Amino acid sequence: DNCGIGAIVNIKGIKTHKTVENALSIVENLEHRAGKDAEGKTGDGVGILLQISHKFFEKAAKNLGINIGKEREYGVGMFFFSQDEFKRKQAMKMFEIIAQKEGLEFLGWRKVPTRPEVLGKKALDVMPGIYQCFVKKPEDCEEGLPFDRKLYILRKVFEQSNEDTYVVSLSSRTIVYKGM
């Protein structure tokens, strides 16, 4: 009863930038539902859930020298890491090790482009290191729910091993973007 929620979908399941633009428009129009601090630049956070855009991530991964394969043959994770570089690198390595132990192939990390200059001081002071990762679907695993179950287990095992990292999302179908 305190949160504003909006939903934008393409009923044909077509992934378009227009859908993202419409979702961001909802976020802007629900600004009155959000809490803000006295400086007026730091809110209590907002997020949008999107279908994974294979076209986008294929290009982004390729720019990093990563081959993610075909659509739904990989998962994308969204992470908020500690600002401390040592803790961040330690957590990243731990995630990679756990992925391997869970029978998954870790493909690589992508630093998410951000615009810290638009943040208020409070948000900037606590801004996490925002990264995405790519995890390959094992050949002996069906795409869809069976693969997402493996990603869920990976996420939960990692979360139990690391309290300095927030896993925003980890899926082969959807991704969550959050901001303040």
Predicted segments — roles?
Residues 1-180:
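N-terminal segments that mediate ammonia production and transfer
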